[in-house]
Amino acid sequence: MRTRSQAIIDDRLLIDFPADTYAHYLKWNIPLDKIKACIITHSHSDHLYPAEIQMRSAGFAHINSVKPQTFYAAESGYNMLADAVKKYNISENDINLKLIKPFESFETEGYVITPIKATHDEKSSPVIYAIKKDEKSLLYANDTSELCEESMACLKALERP
């Protein structure tokens, strides 16, 4: 059976948060209580289903961590997540939101992550990710067509292990 797009790296970094997140947890025993960072590729519902974040709230989840899960998303996804936090009255102790911009690298959980502009529905603020940790790197690129010149230049300029 096909489910919606999601990936996990080292049981620490989650990529995308679709409605199937809980199903993925059940089927593959994803340690959702240990994941502290989630990067969002774009705001289409098969990659981001903001209503699902309320399941991290008290009454639904029993997470023995004092550190909230941080979601990193470009403008459209960030706005959808912020709306869900307000709508479901989610505490800052459960969720932390970070607005990212294409081509501006950031660090989280030991990874250096570079969001790169994807070619997809512009309203969804699409990005692909170059992810690096220690001497390993990964390009996570889906739901994109041919990349623009700026994105190709960014990829070529990235340091390779």
Describe the predicted segments one by one.
Residues 1-30, 98-153:
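Core dinuclear metal-dependent hydrolase active-site scaffold
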Residues 81-92:
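Short, aromatic/basic amphipathic alpha-helical patches
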Residues 47-48, 79-82, 122-124:
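Short, well-ordered, mixed-charge alpha-helical segments that flank or form enzyme active sites
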Residues 155-161:
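Inter-motif core of Ras-like GTPase G domains
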Residues 33-37, 92-98:
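Short hydrophobic/aromatic-enriched beta-strand-loop microsegments
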Residues 67-68, 90-96, 109:
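A short helix-to-beta-strand connector/capping loop
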Residues 12, 18-70:
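Active-site metal-binding motif and surrounding structural segment of the metallo-beta-lactamase
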Residues 68-78:
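Short internal beta-strands
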